Amino acid sequence: MKNIYLSLLFLSLCTLNICSPRNKFLFLNVLNKAVLADNCKDLTFLPIKENVKIMGRYYQKNDITWVVHSGSAVEFYATGNSAQVVIAGGNSIYNDERYRPRFGVYVDDKLVEDKIMDQLEHTVELFKGTTEKTVKVKVMLLSEANNGGVGVKSININSCNETPIKPVEKKKLRIEFIGDSITAGYGVEAPNQYENFKTSTENFSMSYAYLAAKKLDADYSIVCYSGHGIISGYSTGDKNPDQVVPDVYTKISKNEEYPGEWDFENNQNDVIFINLGTNDLNYVSKEPATRNDEFIQEYVNFLTLIREKNPQSYIVCTVGIMGGGDEIYPLIEKAVELVGDKKISSYKSQTQNMNDGLGADWHPSKITQTYNSYVVSDKICNAIGIESDQVGLDVAADSVYDVSKNEANGASMSFWVGYDKSFWINTGMGGKEVTDIEAKCSGIKLKKGGVYILEFEHNSYKETEVPVILRGKDKVHFKDSVKTSNNKTKYSKEITIEENDDNAEIVYQLGTLDSFQFTLSNIKLTKIK
């Protein structure tokens, strides 16, 4: 009330013509603000569904909402002059400092707090000022369930608004991601593969799962545990039955601090994305004659359980980012076939490219995680029947590498494709025409109006020019040439496509070049628009 009395005094002086018209305006403005300020209150809100949106699996006890899985979050709009959120720590604050939970607080999508939780309570200031404003707030667990969660205890706000706190709107699409360390973003911020795990370098906001959900404008829920598998956790070949996801899928969390069964009825998903099998590899591959069938059967059982809990969901299965695709993926394919559910599909993930860097303990780098988010969003679009924009996707990633030679013109050659999809071509006799020997990456789908970047690295022992063509059955979309040298050279060119093509190919024409060795690597055709 003191502010109002002072303002009224100033206004009285103005009415006696003691102050100028400009000062009279300023005094009125002060009076209005003073009245509003006196109507504002310091309020405290609990993080319950009436006030906030809770994303992902969570646990509630003593009015605290614990976010307990990678990416689990509390989101709300706050309208007021100032606001804080109070974060609680649980038993995990006593973990070794490398294994304490990490969380982030975002205001209008900007990270304002990134903290390893090491105390029982911590207050984060969201904003402070004299002018009322509305912001969107998110409190998210950045580390994984293995290392505990953090609790949102209360939201404190000074506000004059009738609705100071309200939930962020739900998205139209909801995706559940089930996985292991790859899904959790294990080591994604580590400088290299030689650094060991710690939660300070694990960041779910850089995981393919988070980025794919963001690209698809979807809500998400995560169930992922590092080192876990379908029938065995990570091992040197002996069975590790204590680290399997199917045994804990129906629980809120494996962590005993957050007991109870998950409420599937009120948390149905439109899509379930499963990325498991990497940690099973060492166990399964040691005795494939018997263990392949064991894996297939347990995967069938897991799909059956997921379908029971999510009757209408589309389910997409994959494995392979950290290897194991050749050994484990066929088993997943077989399990999907045995279940016979038309809403379940699968694909083999491309193994990470070492040239894109590595995170802790040889885990995917930020580049690899980002690229896989484009792949995952594209696969989800295909599964649910909506058009994918394919932006960010390397449409040549699954292309078939092969060569053609015109033996009638005397052309001869050999080729080899490396595990990293490097392409080695050695000509004997080059033939008579430039088209007599062609190295091809085929089976590429192109979209009309799409803008793509064609990239690759090349080298040869001879200096010459090699034609490079992007063509379909009846149309050449692009034509250029590269000058070869003994030094590895990077090529990059932007291409706009004028019409759809479901079976295009990248072609390198090596005809007429006798005894010519040509090496290609990192061939990519990435859609950028």
Please identify what each model-predicted range represents:
Residues 390-529:
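Extracellular and organelle-lumenal recognition/adhesion modules and their flexible linkers in secreted
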Residues 7-15:
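Bacterial N-terminal signal peptides
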Residues 9, 21-178, 183-201, 389-390:
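N-terminal secretory targeting modules
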Residues 86-101, 145-146, 324, 447, ...:
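Extended, low-complexity, turn-rich repeat/linker tracts enriched in Gly/Pro/Ser/Thr and Asp/Glu
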Residues 108, 246-385:
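Alpha-helical cap/lid subdomain in secreted, periplasmic
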Residues 69-71, 188, 194-288, 323-329, ...:
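Conserved SGNH/GDSL esterase-like catalytic core that processes O-acyl groups on lipids
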